[in-house]
Swiss-Prot record:
Gene Ontology cellular-component annotations: mitochondrial inner membrane
Localization: Mitochondrion inner membrane
Main location: mitochondrion
Topology term for the membrane: Multi-pass membrane protein
Biological process terms in GO annotation: aerobic respiration
Catalytic class of the enzyme: translocase
E.C. number(s) listed in UniProt: 7.1.1.2
Protein name, as recorded: NADH-ubiquinone oxidoreductase chain 1
Function, as annotated: Core subunit of the mitochondrial membrane respiratory chain NADH dehydrogenase (Complex I) that is believed to belong to the minimal assembly required for catalysis. Complex I functions in the transfer of electrons from NADH to the respiratory chain. The immediate electron acceptor for the enzyme is believed to be ubiquinone.
GO molecular function: NADH dehydrogenase (ubiquinone) activity
Keywords: Electron transport, Membrane, Mitochondrion, Mitochondrion inner membrane, NAD, Respiratory chain, Translocase, Transmembrane, Transmembrane helix, Transport, Ubiquinone
Amino acid sequence: MDWFVFFVNSILFIVPVLLAVALLTLVERKVLGYMQLRKGPNIVGPFGLLQPIADGFKLLIKETLKPSNASPYLFFFSPVLFLGIALVLWSVIPVKYSVVSVNLSLMLIIGLSSLSVYSLLGSGWSSNSNYSFLGAVRAVAQTVSYEISLGLILLGVVLFAGGFNVEVIESSQSWSWLMFSCFPLFAIWFVSTLAETNRAPFDLTEGESEIVSGYNVEYAGGPFAMFFIAEYANIIFINLLSVLLFLGGSSPMGEFFPVNVLVVSLKAGVLVLLFLWVRASYPRFRYDQLMYLTWKKYLPLSLSFLVFFVVLLGVLDSLPPSSCFL
């Protein structure tokens, strides 16, 4: 019976994620179209609403090709691993019927997200292509570099909230969102999430003018669709995590279902639209600028904020209790 409940909860998580990914592909093309003074998809279905279904069907019926010199097992296992990690990450999101309940959910998120590096490296190496391998090396270096800053920011959030549980962090912002009290930290977090998800202007792993398409250049059909779904699922997830960590989660509506879900979805949708606005507005960075930003700017700033929070909490703990609270 427990396995049946686990299976049902997993399906209830996976299906909305896939639907959200399909909707995001349509919204992205529409938003970019209007920002570039064109209409975007408007042929398939009313107002182009069925365009994601047509795109998905097209990818599924395409032939799955493998380069003759590619490593067959790792070549096909890498997209499966990438998609699996992207979907498993959603299981720790605190909802009414969670798939798993972990006290150290934030640590689990950090650990699982770091595993995606192996799928990117495996796909680039197993393709036996120079473009794929260069894209994979870029992706690994970029992801590992920005994960350090993200980890330090998360430690600062943990110090403020007093726990590694996402639910504890969300409930600690019932009166004031962490974004207001630590806006510089939130700004660094937001830009780092752009780099972590390989989005513009940090999409150097898929630099069309340099390495064609990056680590997935040799993929087609179903395996390419797995990479595509995983990338967009990660975009939605990282913005949902930003809402829970910095924007108070379902605050100010509390835990009233389904109002809380609508509030969180609305906040995450606004952040996703910011992702799309950045893509439409800014050109791609050079690779040296990307690395300079994280190692020379964000890493010292994140570490400085963390040290400041530790010292501040130590000073506040050493102060005697005020007489007005006695």
